[in-house]
């Protein structure tokens, strides 16, 4: 958001952080991941996050290990095999993941993968990128939850906007300081 604010100021337009955040939230309603990446290994993870005072949710995220593209991220009120299965079905609808190998950290995921006809195995070493992504989402949500109402729909819009930023704009040192979709020539 700071880059957007700086760019606006460069053009002589002064906008507050809250206004720019509102733009991101508004855009998130219209953003669809309309790209296809050749997928080889996908790391999947879930993490509990704090929304409002007493409300918690589970963040589910999937990222392609090699390209660093965030494939899907969403919130669920529950954790377990059924929400994991629902998440994987959504991922399968959005991307061609049938031939990809899923790296997971729990037996519940293996059952969910089998239920949606996907394959994977337990892996605790090559999943660092999805763990780091979950940590980043959690940190950003806790840092910025005061600028939005903290509800799950609001957090989901923020999650969509941040996933767009991560895939299209955020440079990654491991990708020669390019965003993931630029590095795989899809932006």
List each language-model region with its residue ranges:
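DNA-recognition alpha helix
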Residues: 1-13
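Major-groove recognition helix of helix-turn-helix-like DNA-binding domains
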Residues: 13-28
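Two-metal-ion RNase H-like nuclease active-site motif
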Residues: 38-52, 61-63
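Short conserved beta-strand segments at catalytic cores or DNA/RNA-binding microdomains
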Residues: 55-80
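Active-site beta-loop-alpha junctions of metal-dependent nucleic acid enzymes
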Residues: 73-97
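Acidic/histidine-rich, metal-coordinating catalytic segments
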Residues: 98-110
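RNase H-like two-metal-ion nuclease catalytic core shared by retroviral integrases
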Residues: 122-142, 153
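C-terminal domain-tail junction helix/linker
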Residues: 143-150, 156-187
């Amino acid at each position: 958001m700071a880059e957007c604010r700086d760019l606006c100021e460069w053009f002589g337009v002064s906008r507050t952080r809250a206004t720019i955040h509102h733009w991101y939230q508004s855009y998130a309603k219209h953003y669809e991941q309309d790209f296809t990446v050749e997928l080889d290994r996908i790391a999947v993870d879930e993490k509990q996050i704090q929304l409002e005072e007493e409300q918690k949710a589970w963040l589910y995220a999937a990222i392609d290990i090699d390209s660093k593209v965030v494939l899907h991220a969403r919130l669920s009120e529950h954790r377990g095999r059924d929400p994991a299965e629902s998440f994987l079905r959504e991922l399968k609808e959005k991307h061609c993941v049938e031939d990809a190998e899923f790296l997971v950290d729990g037996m519940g995921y293996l059952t969910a993968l089998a239920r949606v006809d996907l394959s994977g195995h337990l892996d605790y070493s090559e999943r660092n990128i999805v763990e780091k992504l979950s940590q980043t989402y959690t940190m950003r949500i806790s840092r910025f939850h005061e600028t939005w109402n903290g509800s799950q729909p609001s957090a989901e819009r923020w999650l969509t906007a941040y996933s767009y930023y991560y895939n299209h704009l955020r440079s990654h040192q491991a990708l020669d300081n390019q965003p993931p979709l630029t590095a795989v020539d899809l932006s």
